[in-house]
């Protein structure tokens, strides 16, 4: 792992050192968690920045209507990450336990089984997006021109769906094997390629939204090839050795491992679908407030997604470190790792929220210049900065639950936060005098409720008991 200083790693270590001064964490544990986390955080920053740049390029080339069209197609693309991310969330727990127990053969079959499962889930999406993009976009979009832009974008980006899902499996496999550096290089490199290709296709060839979609597809294919070759050969030129190798001449499916993967991954898929699926009714409800509020709300969500990137590393680092300890049969060590990363995560998110909150107006100016809309966007950005603090608790608590196989509670947490609180509260703003205040509150409860639920489950300690059913020995005895 390279030791060169970088800002992301520096912030994580700074927060960890402050916590260590108060005796809340051990410095060496913070350092190991940081080394595993920061490459994933950089990957998250690259991906979220790429999404922002994509929209900016389309807007500069074609105007706000094209941005709206891509926005209408975006929830369908995010379904890929809901499905693939859920399966990959089960994969990382199973991989980390087998890596900790040196069960190399089981680890390899776990990865190939995960790949087959994720292809089975996402190939139907590819077919649907290619065959009927207009029908799908029209379900959530308004305006013939915007819907047409969204339709053209979705049809082309459909070709990248299975590759994006496979990249999640490859990334989580390496993180589960204590290597976050390699996935960062591959996926962040893919994000850079994506931005460059989009600039060429959108501006150089004038392909508009189709060019943006083509850049996304090609970049995802290249990253998938990198993961596949690296895992099959155990190394890649320039990048170097992989911590695990997945031989191609072996059975690719194992029914018992597939059952364990389904049991651990299905609730995570459900939790992701609860979050992603809510984008559809949420867009409809916010649309009732008018276009100005819609633009402000979308900006707030983009800002919060960018600020939420620490969980890309910290939550998965927790899953990996906790899973390895559980795979070794050391529940006490697993608990210490879980508490360490949770405290580090909470500290990082509090620092991020407190640092950026005073700059809400400046952040808003990066997205809009209209003085009539700027104050509203500023308030939404401020609320987004405040609400993201709860994601530190949620991500830090979900990590050990994911590692142990106790994945139902994060699913329940997402359902409660979005469907029992956030969406009804947002609609209440439309039918009462609360107005935008209800939307502000919905942004907060959307993160606060899941944080409370997952933290409660983590503190109960039940996850340690659940993990005993999914450890390598248990799998072999079934």
Can you say where each PLM-predicted feature lies in the sequence?
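Small-residue-rich hydrophobic transmembrane alpha-helices
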Residues: 67-127, 164-176, 180-183, 294-354, ...
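Generic alpha-helical transmembrane segments of integral inner-membrane proteins
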Residues: 41, 45, 49, 53, ...
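Hydrophobic/aromatic residues within transmembrane alpha-helices of membrane transport systems
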Residues: 42, 46, 54-58, 70, ...
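Transmembrane helical elements of multi-pass membrane transporters/channels
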Residues: 35-58, 156, 219-223, 227, ...
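Interfacial/gating helices of multi-pass transporter permease domains
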Residues: 58-78, 145-149, 209-214, 260-264, ...
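N-terminal transmembrane alpha-helices
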Residues: 24-61, 75-90, 94, 119-126, ...
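Short alpha-helical transmembrane segments in multi-pass integral membrane proteins
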Residues: 1-37, 95-160, 207-265, 322-387, ...
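Short runs within selected transmembrane alpha-helices of multi-pass transporters and secretion channels
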Residues: 81, 85, 153-175, 183-191, ...
